[in-house]
Amino acid sequence: PTHEEQEYNFMVGNGINKLFERALPEGEKTEENVLRVRKEFIPYYDVHNADDSRPYPGISELLSYLQSEGIQLAVASNKYQAATEKLIAYYFPEIRFTAVFGQREGVNVKPDPAVVFDILKLADVEKEDVLYVGDSGVDMQTAANANVTACGITWGFRPRTELEKFNPAYIVDSAKEIEKLVSSTC
């Protein structure tokens, strides 16, 4: 079925299987249909995932700044692993990420904290040294589940009100605010 464009913002964020389940018509939300749609979607998305996407304003500069300050960077996404790696390599080739993790076989999707724990282990850092930045309630819940500091961003897919429900330590309106926040706490 077709959906209003703004509805898609609330379908994404929990992995592609959940996206397909939410998008399918009532009565057709079966695992079989989800897997059928997934099988058709992945080859297309593998080729076209960067067609209409762009980094948000200021993100490339923010990542470069953080890297220059010696801060370890990581990605924890609910996109499937291959798509996550491809998008990050395409948009941020100059950034050295400690980890780039998407949805992986045998690892629960966010808000399960497993992906954060995997990153902590790879980075060899303590929870109290982490700032988990995200644009959705799923991200804020992931940070809470991992017991790391959460920073919600208001320019993503979800409204500020969704972020506020999770009481993150910070909510920011621009990438520059993250830079100031990190500068003041380092």
Model-derived regions, located:
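Structured helix-beta-strand junction loops
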Residues: N14, E69-G70, Q103, F166
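Conserved phosphate-coupling serine/threonine residues in phosphotransfer and NTP-handling enzymes
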Residues: S77-K79
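Asp-based, Mg2+/Mn2+-dependent phosphohydrolase catalytic module
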Residues: Q6, Q81, E85-C186
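N-terminal helical cap/lid subdomain that shapes the substrate entry/recognition surface
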Residues: P1-E61, Y65-E69, A82
